[in-house]
UniProtKB/Swiss-Prot annotation:
Cofactor note (record): Binds 1 Mg(2+) ion per subunit.
GO MF annotation: an example: magnesium ion binding
E.C. number(s) listed in UniProt: 6.2.1.5
Native species: Chromobacterium violaceum (strain ATCC 12472 / DSM 30191 / JCM 1249 / CCUG 213 / NBRC 12614 / NCIMB 9131 / NCTC 9757 / MK)
Chain residues that bind ATP: 46, 53-55, 100, 103, 108
UniProt protein name: Succinate--CoA ligase [ADP-forming] subunit beta
Amino acids binding substrate: 265, 322-324
Higher taxonomy: Bacteria, Pseudomonadati, Pseudomonadota, Betaproteobacteria, Neisseriales
Protein backbone atom coordinates (compact mmCIF):
# COMPACT_ATOMS: atom_id res chain seq x y z
CA UNK A 1 0.00 0.00 0.00
CA UNK A 2 1.35 3.41 -0.97
CA UNK A 3 1.18 6.58 1.09
CA UNK A 4 0.80 10.07 -0.32
CA UNK A 5 3.70 12.49 0.10
CA UNK A 6 1.93 14.44 2.86
CA UNK A 7 1.21 11.20 4.75
CA UNK A 8 4.80 10.00 4.35
CA UNK A 9 6.22 13.29 5.61
CA UNK A 10 3.92 13.28 8.61
CA UNK A 11 5.00 9.75 9.51
CA UNK A 12 8.71 10.44 9.03
CA UNK A 13 8.55 13.61 11.12
CA UNK A 14 7.46 11.49 14.10
CA UNK A 15 10.86 9.80 13.94
CA UNK A 16 12.76 13.06 14.01
CA UNK A 17 13.35 13.48 10.29
CA UNK A 18 13.47 17.14 9.17
CA UNK A 19 10.79 17.42 6.50
CA UNK A 20 9.80 20.27 4.22
CA UNK A 21 6.75 21.88 5.78
CA UNK A 22 3.55 21.75 3.80
CA UNK A 23 -0.19 22.23 4.10
CA UNK A 24 -2.71 19.98 2.37
CA UNK A 25 -5.29 21.76 0.23
CA UNK A 26 -8.38 20.25 -1.38
CA UNK A 27 -9.58 23.42 -3.09
CA UNK A 28 -8.10 26.58 -4.67
CA UNK A 29 -9.26 28.59 -1.65
CA UNK A 30 -7.43 26.27 0.74
CA UNK A 31 -4.31 26.50 -1.44
CA UNK A 32 -4.38 30.31 -1.27
CA UNK A 33 -4.81 30.20 2.51
CA UNK A 34 -1.93 27.72 2.78
CA UNK A 35 0.33 30.06 0.79
CA UNK A 36 -0.45 32.90 3.19
CA UNK A 37 0.18 30.72 6.23
CA UNK A 38 3.58 29.52 4.98
CA UNK A 39 4.63 33.13 4.47
CA UNK A 40 7.63 32.66 2.18
CA UNK A 41 8.68 34.52 -0.97
CA UNK A 42 7.32 31.61 -2.97
CA UNK A 43 5.85 28.15 -2.44
CA UNK A 44 5.66 24.86 -4.31
CA UNK A 45 2.30 23.29 -5.17
CA UNK A 46 2.50 19.51 -5.57
CA UNK A 47 -0.20 17.19 -6.91
CA UNK A 48 -0.83 14.33 -4.48
CA UNK A 49 -0.84 11.11 -6.50
CA UNK A 50 0.71 7.66 -6.06
CA UNK A 51 3.22 8.08 -8.87
CA UNK A 52 6.68 9.46 -9.52
CA UNK A 53 7.62 11.83 -12.31
CA UNK A 54 5.17 14.51 -11.17
CA UNK A 55 7.48 17.40 -11.98
CA UNK A 56 7.98 16.52 -15.63
CA UNK A 57 4.23 15.87 -15.98
CA UNK A 58 3.29 19.33 -14.71
CA UNK A 59 2.25 18.17 -11.26
CA UNK A 60 4.77 20.32 -9.35
CA UNK A 61 4.66 24.10 -9.78
CA UNK A 62 6.47 27.02 -8.14
CA UNK A 63 4.11 29.88 -7.24
CA UNK A 64 4.89 33.42 -6.10
CA UNK A 65 1.50 34.66 -4.89
CA UNK A 66 -1.68 33.41 -3.24
CA UNK A 67 -3.55 33.98 -6.51
CA UNK A 68 -1.04 31.86 -8.41
CA UNK A 69 -1.31 29.12 -5.78
CA UNK A 70 -5.08 29.09 -6.17
CA UNK A 71 -4.84 29.02 -9.97
CA UNK A 72 -2.40 26.09 -10.01
CA UNK A 73 -4.56 24.18 -7.52
CA UNK A 74 -7.59 24.84 -9.73
CA UNK A 75 -5.83 23.41 -12.79
CA UNK A 76 -4.70 20.27 -10.90
CA UNK A 77 -7.50 19.28 -8.52
CA UNK A 78 -10.15 17.20 -10.22
CA UNK A 79 -7.92 16.17 -13.12
CA UNK A 80 -5.87 13.06 -13.84
CA UNK A 81 -2.09 13.36 -13.86
CA UNK A 82 -0.29 11.19 -16.40
CA UNK A 83 3.38 10.42 -15.66
CA UNK A 84 5.90 7.85 -16.86
CA UNK A 85 4.82 5.66 -13.92
CA UNK A 86 1.07 5.69 -14.66
CA UNK A 87 -1.03 4.22 -17.43
CA UNK A 88 -2.60 6.36 -20.15
CA UNK A 89 -5.52 7.27 -17.89
CA UNK A 90 -3.24 8.69 -15.19
CA UNK A 91 -3.99 9.12 -11.48
CA UNK A 92 -6.75 11.35 -10.08
CA UNK A 93 -5.61 14.48 -8.25
CA UNK A 94 -7.89 15.01 -5.25
CA UNK A 95 -5.61 17.37 -3.34
CA UNK A 96 -2.37 19.34 -3.52
CA UNK A 97 0.38 19.92 -0.99
CA UNK A 98 1.47 23.56 -0.69
CA UNK A 99 5.08 23.45 0.51
CA UNK A 100 7.44 26.00 2.02
CA UNK A 101 10.23 27.84 0.24
CA UNK A 102 13.35 25.62 0.44
CA UNK A 103 15.57 26.89 -2.34
CA UNK A 104 18.29 27.65 -3.25
CA UNK A 105 20.09 24.61 -1.82
CA UNK A 106 23.74 23.58 -1.86
CA UNK A 107 23.15 20.00 -3.01
CA UNK A 108 20.43 17.45 -3.64
CA UNK A 109 21.09 13.97 -2.24
CA UNK A 110 19.22 10.67 -2.34
CA UNK A 111 18.24 8.34 0.51
CA UNK A 112 16.22 5.16 0.09
CA UNK A 113 15.70 1.66 1.45
CA UNK A 114 14.10 -1.59 0.32
CA UNK A 115 13.69 -5.14 1.55
CA UNK A 116 16.29 -6.99 -0.52
CA UNK A 117 15.22 -10.59 -1.10
CA UNK A 118 18.69 -11.58 -2.25
CA UNK A 119 20.43 -10.71 1.01
CA UNK A 120 17.22 -11.14 3.05
CA UNK A 121 17.93 -7.82 4.72
CA UNK A 122 16.87 -4.21 4.64
CA UNK A 123 19.26 -2.41 2.31
CA UNK A 124 19.72 1.36 2.47
CA UNK A 125 20.93 3.31 -0.54
CA UNK A 126 22.48 6.77 -0.65
CA UNK A 127 23.69 8.81 -3.58
CA UNK A 128 25.02 12.25 -4.39
CA UNK A 129 22.73 12.20 -7.44
CA UNK A 130 19.50 13.33 -5.80
CA UNK A 131 16.66 15.15 -7.50
CA UNK A 132 16.70 12.90 -10.57
CA UNK A 133 15.20 9.52 -11.42
CA UNK A 134 17.22 7.06 -9.35
CA UNK A 135 16.40 4.33 -11.89
CA UNK A 136 18.38 6.26 -14.49
CA UNK A 137 21.32 6.65 -12.09
CA UNK A 138 21.25 2.91 -11.35
CA UNK A 139 21.33 2.14 -15.06
CA UNK A 140 23.88 4.68 -16.27
CA UNK A 141 26.18 5.26 -13.27
CA UNK A 142 25.52 2.51 -10.71
CA UNK A 143 28.79 3.26 -8.95
CA UNK A 144 27.20 6.47 -7.65
CA UNK A 145 24.75 4.50 -5.50
CA UNK A 146 26.20 3.29 -2.20
CA UNK A 147 24.40 0.36 -0.54
CA UNK A 148 24.33 -0.40 3.17
CA UNK A 149 23.04 -3.79 4.34
CA UNK A 150 21.51 -3.82 7.81
CA UNK A 151 21.95 -6.89 10.01
CA UNK A 152 18.47 -7.66 11.40
CA UNK A 153 19.95 -8.94 14.67
CA UNK A 154 21.56 -5.63 15.64
CA UNK A 155 19.79 -3.11 13.40
CA UNK A 156 21.27 -0.01 11.82
CA UNK A 157 24.50 0.93 13.59
CA UNK A 158 25.70 4.54 14.04
CA UNK A 159 28.98 3.77 12.26
CA UNK A 160 27.03 2.70 9.16
CA UNK A 161 25.15 6.00 9.11
CA UNK A 162 28.42 7.94 9.56
CA UNK A 163 30.08 5.99 6.75
CA UNK A 164 27.15 6.87 4.49
CA UNK A 165 27.46 10.54 5.44
CA UNK A 166 31.18 10.56 4.60
CA UNK A 167 30.44 8.83 1.28
CA UNK A 168 28.07 11.69 0.46
CA UNK A 169 30.80 14.23 1.15
CA UNK A 170 29.22 15.61 4.31
CA UNK A 171 31.34 17.02 7.12
CA UNK A 172 31.18 18.49 10.59
CA UNK A 173 27.71 18.89 12.08
CA UNK A 174 26.19 17.60 8.83
CA UNK A 175 27.50 14.10 9.60
CA UNK A 176 25.72 14.02 12.96
CA UNK A 177 22.52 15.40 11.41
CA UNK A 178 22.56 12.85 8.60
CA UNK A 179 23.32 9.99 11.00
CA UNK A 180 20.33 10.93 13.14
CA UNK A 181 18.17 11.13 10.02
CA UNK A 182 19.30 7.75 8.72
CA UNK A 183 18.87 6.00 12.07
CA UNK A 184 15.39 7.49 12.37
CA UNK A 185 14.59 6.26 8.87
CA UNK A 186 15.57 2.73 9.81
CA UNK A 187 13.45 2.83 12.97
CA UNK A 188 10.46 4.05 10.94
CA UNK A 189 11.08 1.34 8.32
CA UNK A 190 11.08 -1.50 10.85
CA UNK A 191 8.34 -0.32 13.19
CA UNK A 192 5.88 0.39 10.36
CA UNK A 193 6.72 -2.55 8.07
CA UNK A 194 7.86 -0.54 5.05
CA UNK A 195 8.50 -2.39 1.82
CA UNK A 196 10.11 0.68 0.23
CA UNK A 197 11.19 4.08 1.49
CA UNK A 198 12.61 7.00 -0.48
CA UNK A 199 13.57 10.62 0.07
CA UNK A 200 14.41 12.23 -3.26
CA UNK A 201 15.69 14.82 -3.01
CA UNK A 202 17.23 15.10 0.42
CA UNK A 203 18.27 18.74 0.32
CA UNK A 204 21.40 20.19 1.89
CA UNK A 205 20.32 23.79 2.44
CA UNK A 206 22.56 26.83 2.25
CA UNK A 207 22.50 27.09 6.05
CA UNK A 208 23.93 23.56 6.24
CA UNK A 209 20.72 21.91 7.39
CA UNK A 210 19.20 18.80 5.82
CA UNK A 211 15.56 18.57 4.77
CA UNK A 212 13.39 15.86 3.20
CA UNK A 213 11.86 17.67 0.23
CA UNK A 214 9.88 14.63 -0.89
CA UNK A 215 8.85 11.37 0.72
CA UNK A 216 7.75 8.06 -0.74
CA UNK A 217 6.63 5.09 1.36
CA UNK A 218 5.26 1.74 0.29
CA UNK A 219 3.92 -0.43 3.10
CA UNK A 220 3.99 -4.23 3.17
CA UNK A 221 0.33 -5.07 2.54
CA UNK A 222 0.75 -8.39 4.37
CA UNK A 223 1.54 -6.51 7.58
CA UNK A 224 -1.25 -3.92 7.47
CA UNK A 225 -3.26 -5.84 10.07
CA UNK A 226 -0.66 -4.64 12.57
CA UNK A 227 -1.12 -0.99 11.56
CA UNK A 228 -4.82 -0.07 11.47
CA UNK A 229 -3.94 3.62 11.72
CA UNK A 230 -1.93 3.37 8.49
CA UNK A 231 -4.53 1.21 6.76
CA UNK A 232 -7.05 3.97 7.47
CA UNK A 233 -4.95 6.27 5.26
CA UNK A 234 -5.39 4.06 2.19
CA UNK A 235 -6.54 6.04 -0.86
CA UNK A 236 -8.45 3.61 -3.05
CA UNK A 237 -8.97 6.28 -5.72
CA UNK A 238 -5.29 5.85 -6.61
CA UNK A 239 -5.67 2.12 -7.20
CA UNK A 240 -7.12 0.14 -10.09
CA UNK A 241 -10.82 -0.28 -9.34
CA UNK A 242 -10.82 -3.95 -10.28
CA UNK A 243 -7.72 -4.65 -8.18
CA UNK A 244 -9.42 -3.06 -5.16
CA UNK A 245 -12.51 -5.19 -5.73
CA UNK A 246 -10.34 -8.31 -6.07
CA UNK A 247 -8.64 -7.67 -2.73
CA UNK A 248 -12.04 -7.71 -1.01
CA UNK A 249 -12.46 -11.35 -2.08
CA UNK A 250 -8.82 -12.37 -1.49
CA UNK A 251 -8.18 -12.62 -5.22
CA UNK A 252 -4.76 -11.76 -6.61
CA UNK A 253 -5.55 -9.58 -9.63
CA UNK A 254 -3.32 -7.35 -11.74
CA UNK A 255 -4.74 -5.54 -14.75
CA UNK A 256 -2.73 -5.76 -17.99
CA UNK A 257 -3.25 -4.31 -21.47
CA UNK A 258 -4.26 -7.35 -23.53
CA UNK A 259 -7.63 -8.77 -24.57
CA UNK A 260 -7.59 -12.36 -23.22
CA UNK A 261 -8.84 -12.66 -19.67
CA UNK A 262 -7.14 -15.30 -17.51
CA UNK A 263 -8.54 -17.15 -14.48
CA UNK A 264 -6.05 -19.54 -12.91
CA UNK A 265 -5.45 -21.15 -9.51
CA UNK A 266 -1.85 -20.68 -8.39
CA UNK A 267 0.54 -17.83 -9.14
CA UNK A 268 3.09 -20.00 -10.95
CA UNK A 269 0.46 -21.57 -13.18
CA UNK A 270 -1.01 -18.11 -13.81
CA UNK A 271 2.35 -16.79 -15.04
CA UNK A 272 2.89 -19.87 -17.19
CA UNK A 273 -0.60 -19.37 -18.66
CA UNK A 274 0.19 -15.76 -19.59
CA UNK A 275 3.50 -16.85 -21.11
CA UNK A 276 1.90 -19.47 -23.35
CA UNK A 277 -0.82 -17.04 -24.45
CA UNK A 278 1.95 -14.68 -25.58
CA UNK A 279 3.79 -17.57 -27.22
CA UNK A 280 0.69 -18.43 -29.26
CA UNK A 281 0.29 -14.83 -30.44
CA UNK A 282 -2.23 -13.53 -27.89
CA UNK A 283 -2.14 -10.80 -25.25
CA UNK A 284 -3.24 -11.49 -21.65
CA UNK A 285 -5.60 -8.89 -20.18
CA UNK A 286 -4.83 -9.71 -16.57
CA UNK A 287 -3.10 -11.84 -13.98
CA UNK A 288 -5.72 -13.48 -11.78
CA UNK A 289 -4.98 -16.14 -9.19
CA UNK A 290 -8.11 -17.46 -7.46
CA UNK A 291 -5.93 -19.39 -5.00
CA UNK A 292 -5.50 -23.04 -4.15
CA UNK A 293 -8.63 -23.12 -2.02
CA UNK A 294 -10.91 -21.44 -4.53
CA UNK A 295 -14.60 -21.42 -3.61
CA UNK A 296 -17.61 -21.17 -5.87
CA UNK A 297 -18.25 -17.59 -4.72
CA UNK A 298 -14.68 -16.49 -5.44
CA UNK A 299 -14.78 -18.02 -8.93
CA UNK A 300 -17.99 -16.11 -9.68
CA UNK A 301 -16.44 -12.85 -8.45
CA UNK A 302 -13.31 -13.57 -10.49
CA UNK A 303 -15.42 -13.95 -13.61
CA UNK A 304 -17.14 -10.64 -12.88
CA UNK A 305 -13.77 -8.92 -12.45
CA UNK A 306 -12.42 -10.22 -15.74
CA UNK A 307 -15.49 -9.23 -17.71
CA UNK A 308 -15.63 -5.79 -16.10
CA UNK A 309 -12.66 -5.01 -18.35
CA UNK A 310 -14.24 -3.89 -21.62
CA UNK A 311 -11.10 -4.80 -23.58
CA UNK A 312 -11.56 -8.53 -22.82
CA UNK A 313 -12.61 -10.44 -25.95
CA UNK A 314 -12.16 -13.96 -24.61
CA UNK A 315 -11.46 -15.83 -21.36
CA UNK A 316 -9.11 -18.73 -20.66
CA UNK A 317 -9.80 -20.66 -17.45
CA UNK A 318 -6.91 -22.90 -16.41
CA UNK A 319 -7.51 -24.92 -13.25
CA UNK A 320 -5.38 -27.63 -11.68
CA UNK A 321 -7.43 -29.57 -9.14
CA UNK A 322 -5.16 -30.25 -6.21
CA UNK A 323 -6.95 -28.89 -3.17
CA UNK A 324 -9.89 -27.61 -5.20
CA UNK A 325 -12.21 -30.02 -7.06
CA UNK A 326 -12.64 -29.49 -10.79
CA UNK A 327 -16.35 -30.39 -10.67
CA UNK A 328 -16.92 -27.58 -8.16
CA UNK A 329 -15.03 -25.18 -10.43
CA UNK A 330 -17.14 -26.34 -13.38
CA UNK A 331 -20.35 -25.62 -11.46
CA UNK A 332 -19.02 -22.19 -10.47
CA UNK A 333 -18.10 -21.41 -14.09
CA UNK A 334 -21.60 -22.33 -15.26
CA UNK A 335 -23.19 -20.22 -12.51
CA UNK A 336 -20.95 -17.26 -13.36
CA UNK A 337 -21.60 -17.49 -17.11
CA UNK A 338 -25.34 -17.47 -16.46
CA UNK A 339 -25.20 -14.68 -13.87
CA UNK A 340 -22.87 -12.36 -15.79
CA UNK A 341 -24.37 -13.11 -19.21
CA UNK A 342 -21.05 -13.86 -20.88
CA UNK A 343 -20.94 -13.07 -24.59
CA UNK A 344 -17.24 -13.66 -25.29
CA UNK A 345 -15.57 -17.03 -26.06
CA UNK A 346 -14.61 -19.06 -22.98
CA UNK A 347 -12.04 -21.87 -23.11
CA UNK A 348 -11.69 -24.13 -20.06
CA UNK A 349 -8.81 -26.45 -19.23
CA UNK A 350 -9.33 -28.66 -16.16
CA UNK A 351 -6.71 -31.07 -14.81
CA UNK A 352 -6.45 -33.07 -11.60
CA UNK A 353 -9.04 -33.81 -8.93
CA UNK A 354 -12.37 -34.77 -10.60
CA UNK A 355 -11.23 -33.28 -13.93
CA UNK A 356 -13.26 -35.74 -16.01
CA UNK A 357 -16.40 -35.05 -14.00
CA UNK A 358 -15.79 -31.30 -14.34
CA UNK A 359 -15.41 -31.59 -18.12
CA UNK A 360 -18.61 -33.64 -18.31
CA UNK A 361 -20.54 -31.01 -16.34
CA UNK A 362 -19.32 -28.29 -18.72
CA UNK A 363 -20.14 -30.32 -21.83
CA UNK A 364 -23.66 -31.03 -20.61
CA UNK A 365 -24.36 -27.45 -19.54
CA UNK A 366 -25.67 -26.37 -22.92
CA UNK A 367 -23.52 -23.22 -22.74
CA UNK A 368 -20.95 -22.10 -25.28
CA UNK A 369 -17.92 -23.30 -23.33
CA UNK A 370 -14.95 -24.85 -25.13
CA UNK A 371 -13.07 -27.63 -23.34
CA UNK A 372 -9.33 -28.01 -23.91
CA UNK A 373 -6.95 -30.93 -23.46
CA UNK A 374 -3.70 -29.55 -22.11
CA UNK A 375 -2.29 -26.05 -21.84
CA UNK A 376 -1.06 -25.82 -25.44
CA UNK A 377 -4.48 -26.76 -26.75
CA UNK A 378 -6.18 -24.26 -24.44
CA UNK A 379 -3.93 -21.37 -25.48
CA UNK A 380 -4.30 -22.14 -29.18
CA UNK A 381 -8.09 -22.32 -28.90
CA UNK A 382 -8.55 -19.04 -27.02
CA UNK A 383 -6.14 -17.13 -29.28
CA UNK A 384 -7.93 -18.45 -32.37
CA UNK A 385 -11.35 -17.64 -30.91
CA UNK A 386 -10.37 -14.07 -30.05
CA UNK A 387 -8.84 -13.46 -33.48
CA UNK A 388 -12.05 -14.77 -35.07
CA UNK A 389 -14.11 -12.29 -33.02
CA UNK A 390 -11.77 -9.39 -33.79
Amino acid sequence: MNLHEYQAKELLSRYGLPVQQGILAKSPEEAAAAYDKLGGKFAVVKAQVHAGGRGKAGGVKVVKSREEAAEVAKTLIGTNLVTYQTDAAGQPVNSVLVCEDMYPVQRELYLGAVVDRGSQRVVFMVSTEGGVEIEKVAEETPEKIIKIEVDPLVGMQPFQARDAAFALGLSGAQVAAFSKLMLGSYQAFIENDFALFEVNPLALRENGELACVDGKINLDSNALYRHPELLAQRDKSQENEREVKASEFDLNYVALEGNIGCMVNGAGLAMATMDIIKLKGGQPANFLDVGGGATKERVIEAFKLILADTSVQGVLINIFGGIVRCDMIAEAIIAAVKEVNVTVPVVVRLEGNNAELGAKILDESGLKLTSAQGLNDAAEKIVAAVKAVA
